[in-house]
Regions:
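Extracellular/periplasmic catalytic domains that process cell-envelope and extracellular macromolecules
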Residues: 30-34, 65, 169-172
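Short, small-residue-biased leader/transition segments that mark boundaries at the very start
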Residues: 2-8
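Active-site nucleophile-His-acid catalytic modules used for acyl/amide transfer and hydrolysis
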Residues: 10-53
């Protein structure tokens, strides 16, 4: 309806104003497609990312790799469950990848092709730096994200089939699990 269209237009104008302020305050220049991608992100998740997030820090610095940017945008793919926990939402994963394609390549097709995700599963023995990262297809998993523990030695990320992840090239979506020294010597 026309009324609903007016509501959406006002919401978008509000996000444009906030993004314009963020860009001006931080002397950031963007291309039209980069601006469009950040408006799409803001419309979906709000403007909180403009405060103290990895994405805002990268944009402020002006120096970032494709994968750093991908993971900084990709981390915004969670929804809150009724119990209060935040979980990865597959639809938002696809949306973030499509926004990346707009930001990086001016590709407005809505496709999420060209990127893969790695999900880092939480373990009881330690903490992980993040629960998901995005990587451009064919690239190396860089930046990489480790797991840490005050009492355990981290041995690496293992696949669902129990094999150490040694091929660090983004060729498919993967779920990996932290393995600890005590897992082998208990």
């Amino acid at each position: 309806s026309r009324g609903l269209g007016d509501v959406y237009k006002r919401q978008l104008q509000g996000f444009e104003k906030k993004l314009d302020s963020f860009l001006t305050e931080n002397s950031i220049s963007l291309s039209d497609n980069q601006y469009d991608a950040l408006i799409s992100l803001s419309y979906n998740i709000g403007s909180g990312w403009m405060k103290n997030s990895a994405l805002s820090a990268l944009l402020k610095s002006g120096f970032y790799s494709t994968n750093e940017l991908a993971s900084a945008m990709g981390i915004w793919c969670h929804v809150k469950e009724s119990g209060g926990d935040y979980v990865i939402h597959d639809g938002l994963v696809s949306r973030r990848m499509a926004e990346l394609r707009v930001f990086l390549y001016a590709d407005y097709s809505g496709s999420s092709d060209g990127f893969y995700w790695v999900r880092f599963v939480q373990t009881e023995k330690g903490d992980r730096a993040r629960d998901i990262a995005f990587y451009e297809a064919g690239s190396t998993y860089d930046p990489s994200f480790d797991a840490t523990s005050n009492t355990e030695v981290f041995l690496g990320w293992y696949t669902e089939s129990g094999e150490l992840l040694t091929d660090l090239t983004a060729t498919e979506n993967r779920t990996v699990y932290a393995q600890w020294e005590s897992d082998f010597y208990d």
